[in-house]
């Protein structure tokens, strides 16, 4: 707030307000309008352009590209609170600065990446989860009270809908799988966890 920012949670955007060919704000599901010089969406392009705009507000090329965009695979998000950083000494040696590790990518081979995609495309939980891990508390310690760290992990590729199960049924198993994979690279990871959740 001291920087002039207000973050609202559970504020569903119903429509982008367009005036004179430019986005001028958003209308929330409850009817409230928020005006702004800049409108940015963190929703995927299909959801943004197909549900938040009227078709006549967009040019034909944008509509065609949005319609042709394939969205047959997705991801899950793994969030964790840890009492210490992942120990990567087996890969980086004993002299590395743990606080300098902001991003970690787990994708050991092209074949691993391809298998992750194939699993998702066939509606299965990925047997080879590709991970994009961020530990923002290494550069912004105010994200946690006292000691400890937080992790945000985008896990690719996972199908939006599972073929023979549901995400509700698989959420805990997927979380355990993610913990096991990270622990192959950082053996202290499981014991460092204070809490974790998986979002689908």
Report each predicted region and the residues it spans.
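FAD-dependent oxidoreductase catalytic-site/capping-region signature
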Residues: 129-200
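Mid-domain catalytic core of redox enzymes
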Residues: 5, 14-144
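Conserved redox-cofactor binding core of oxidoreductases
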Residues: 1
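Flavin (primarily FAD) cofactor-binding/catalytic cores of flavoenzymes
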Residues: 11
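General small-molecule cofactor/ligand-binding pocket signal
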Residues: 6-8, 194
